[in-house]
Amino acid sequence: RTSQQECQGILEMQGDCGIIVRVNCASISDMRGTIMVKIDLITGFLGAGKTTFIKEYASYLLRQGLNIGILENDFGAVNVDMMLLQELQGEKCELEMISGGCDKETHRRRFKTKLISMAMCGYDRVIVEPSGIYDVDEFFDGLREEPLDRWYEIGSVITIVDAGLEENLSDQAEYLLGSEAADAGVIVLSRLDKDNACEEQENRIISHVNR
């Protein structure tokens, strides 16, 4: 579980816009001279605000002059995220999508194949949202396998949590939340009240994650 001290670093996403992104990217200035590609994992429940965060985070990285790739996953759903991210597409940002696959294992193989091809594109950073086909630990294990371990290293692991998260979650949802929070370097709160109760919401989520 994420400790109280770690959770005090929760960031804010206010509403669907006006996101405050303060992710630590101290290594950005050093990445130009490295061979390994940083891979950022963005996790969170369906509807938590992952795509909105990816859009803002990718825009921030582009302003730093980085070349980035975004790998979208449409397993089990019609992919609308790609449409929301299209405006990022350009010389320094490419969007890739994993589509189709009748089962999870087939989709995982396609996911790995796509990561292999992206490793050869000269990106500084690759942003991945693996929900539906991997949990974070499984994804880490996959990156340690040949040939991905030659090209990738873990960058930021960021979990998006809706500030209005229900108190009474199913056992499966509680396990998933705890697992994602435990692996995250940063927890980002989405949909915080702009005018009041921000601190109360933060404390409630911290308490929920740590219980």
Model-assigned labels for residue ranges:
Residues 12-14, 32:
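Position-driven detector of the extreme protein N-terminus
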Residues 37-43, 48, 52-170:
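Nucleotide-state-sensitive switch-loop elements of NTP-binding domains
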Residues 120, 178-181:
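A short, aliphatic-rich alpha-helical micro-motif
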